[in-house]
Design a protein with these regions (language model features):
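Histidine-centered divalent metal-coordination motifs
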Residues: 93-95
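Conserved beta-strand-loop surface patch within small alpha/beta domains used
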Residues: 2-88, 97-151
Length: 151
């Protein structure tokens, strides 16, 4: 994956938002969980900052290996984030037993260039990684994940 300087390469979580992603993923058991990340979206090389998570229902036909957010719920969550005064930063989902990186299915279903796709992998200790979708030609670019100390 080549580096695209148009998009930031770092995502920073508040401690509360990071903990909520891990908690949601852990509570999902064998099924993938998903949601929307909100806060301040970084442009031109600035880090995006996630301060809010909006949990969604996974409506995929095979939730153990896939995730999907119903279009109506996705629109509702985006509107809620915007009404709360936040930018949509990206999306998250879990890989209960899968890899710590995006799968081929994740890449095939990514549709928001410039936004972050966060994965909480649970095979062993929870691992939170983030990848910026750079479009069909460039694919995903891994981002550095940072967590602020305050709650």
């Amino acid at each position: 994956m080549r580096r695209n300087r148009l998009f930031p390469t770092m995502i920073e979580f508040s401690r509360a938002a990071y903990d909520d992603v891990v908690s949601h993923a852990s509570a999902g058991g064998d099924a993938e969980v998903c949601g929307v990340l909100a806060g301040t979206r970084g442009d031109d090389g600035e880090a995006s900052v996630v301060t809010e998570t909006y949990r969604a229902e996974n409506v995929a036909d095979t939730p153990r290996t896939r995730y999907a957010i119903a279009p109506e719920e996705l629109l509702e969550l985006i509107e809620r984030a915007e009404d709360d005064g936040f930018d949509v930063v990206g999306f998250y989902h879990s890989h209960p037993t899968g890899p710590t990186r995006p799968s081929e299915t994740d890449a095939a279903r990514a549709t928001w260039p410039g936004y972050s796709y966060v994965i909480c992998a649970l095979d062993g200790s929870p691992f939170v990684g983030s990848w910026r979708w750079c479009g069909d030609e460039s694919g995903f670019e891994q981002e550095t994940v940072a967590v602020r100390g305050e709650r």
